[in-house]
Each structure stands twice: as C-alpha cells, then as structure tokens.
C-alpha cells in the first residue's frame, strides 16, 4: 500500500476546528488499514504571523512542495486587520497558489436531497444539482499588469486593472474541464464576454480549438458570462462542467454556492500542471467558507466542506476515487438522518456540534466499509 504525504494547514478561526475532523478521519483510515497517510502540520495566515511575522514561512512552503496534497483550513480575522499588507493572512494562501503553480480551481456545487429545502430556490430547481465550476486561477484581471491608481493632478484619479490571457493558459484550463466532463456527464459550458472583451474572443477561440482537436466526444456550448449567471439561477441543472476565467469564475462559483443552501457544505480543489516524469500534480484542497471568527471556538462550525475537500484530495490527487465515493455517501447518509450543524438546521432536524458531525460521518463511513 502506497503511503501518501499530506500537509495539514488549519489556519485561523474555525479552520482548526474543522481540520480536527479531517485528522479524525485520517487516523481511522490509517488504523483500519484502508489507507496509509503521513501527515505534517504547519502554520498559515494569522497563526503564522503571530508566530513568525509572516503569513507562511519558507519551511512550511518546503513541506507543501514535498507533499502529495495540501489540506487547507481557513485564514483571516479582525485580529490581523492592522498587520503589514505583505504579511496579511490571505498572503499565505496566495503564496501557496503561486509557488505551487495552482492554475485550476475546481468548485463543485452539489445539493444533497436532504438539504434541498435549505436553498433559496425551489426544491425542484435544485434537488439533485451537481455542477463543477472550473475557474482559471493564476491569470486574468487579478494578476494582469499594469495595475495602478494614478493621480491626474486635477482632483481626479484613474484606476487601471489589466485583463490578460495567453493561449497556453486557456488551453490548459480547457483540458482540465474537458477531462473532468469525460468522467461526469460529458458536457462543458464555456463562459466569457466575447461580445465586449478581446480576452473573451480569444477564450472562445481557444476553448473551441482544444475541443475540436482533442475532445470531440465531449459536448461543448458557449454562454456569455452574464447570461450564464442568470441561467445558473433560472435552470442550474442544465450545467455539468462550467469553465471560465478568473474574474467570472470568482463570481459564478459564489452564485452556484448559494444554490446548495450553505457555504459550509462546499469544498474546493486547486490543481497545478501534471509533472511529465511522475504523472502527479501539485494540489491544495480547502473549504469555500472563511475563518468565521464570530463562531470560532463555539463548536458550531460545519465540517462537511472540510471533509468533502479531503474527499476531493482522495479523488484528484491520491487515486482513491472509490473511497471518495464512500465518503460522499457517508455525508449524504448523515444528512438524511436529520443531523445538522446550526448553519443548515431546519424544522424537525437535530442540531449537533462540529465534533459530533465529524464523528457521525466517520461512523457512517465505518458502517459502509463493514
């Protein structure tokens, strides 16, 4: 049995609480002989700043580079609002993405049947929803130069952000989306704004070319990003895999998140290039929710997104898809029994703590393996 090296970075706020439930799961998998994991722990975000006056140390980055997957909690909180800009908690997350070359962000939006009534949309619109949004993570307007605010000297200022994409950046994110679709329902929807943006024109051309050259078996369609956002709310189950740029992906994934009822349910993955020699890629897995300092330490945090993020690591980095499927089944079964953390409670359900939810999911997984 192969041993997988994991780096656990709990971070700040509820990050430590939800990561404890991943550790619980890993401990059981090791003891049961189902898998073999070696884990390292590190500081990131505000916790790293308190210890070392940086958002992540070089030593922790070295551990990340050497790991098979990084499991990340959450960073930030008002405690660190006054720290230097380059040492702010979020800088640790940005350095991990940059130094590991994580260009593809995978954001699934799944609505469990037991939670269909928690969505702001009607049950028949969201029940059974299963979308994967593939967001380009290292290019586009967030990173393009120049990025300036200029004083024009006449009482006015001018702000400039630059949207830039090269062909190779679009090709590689397109391949990630098409490869995912082949393992799902075989459909990709590409979203951009080709009607008003030159980057949208190039995006459309390159995605189409990659499809026609390498993925003719996958259904491809195109939507403008604004109408795509409308369709996510109007008829979300038309989508399988959505591929889009950094800016639109940021927006569309948050829209999709709210279809499911709670940010506490949503995992994510960030993937790098496949190494030609090893066949592996750098990767990081994290819940979509933040550090939620208002509930930190109260045992109220929902650990499902964190556990589901670990499930994505099993699937996309560790070649343990069958175990990932069982973990998904265990989560669904616990929810079907009416067990809830406070963020997803509803009439007739039982509210339990963070640790109780984690324990219930591991117990359900044990039963599935019995």
UniProtKB/Swiss-Prot annotation:
Site keyed Important for catalysis: positions: 142, 193
The protein's annotated pathway: Amino-acid biosynthesis; L-leucine biosynthesis; L-leucine from 3-methyl-2-oxobutanoate: step 3/4
Positions with a binding annotation for Mg(2+): 226, 250, 254
Name of the protein in its database record: 3-isopropylmalate dehydrogenase
EC assignment: 1.1.1.85
Assembly, per entry: Homodimer.
Protein encoded by which gene: leuB
Subcellular location: Cytoplasm
Reactions mediated catalytically: (2R,3S)-3-isopropylmalate + NAD(+) = 4-methyl-2-oxopentanoate + CO2 + NADH
Residues annotated as binding NAD(+): 77-90, 290-302
Chief site of localization: cytoplasm
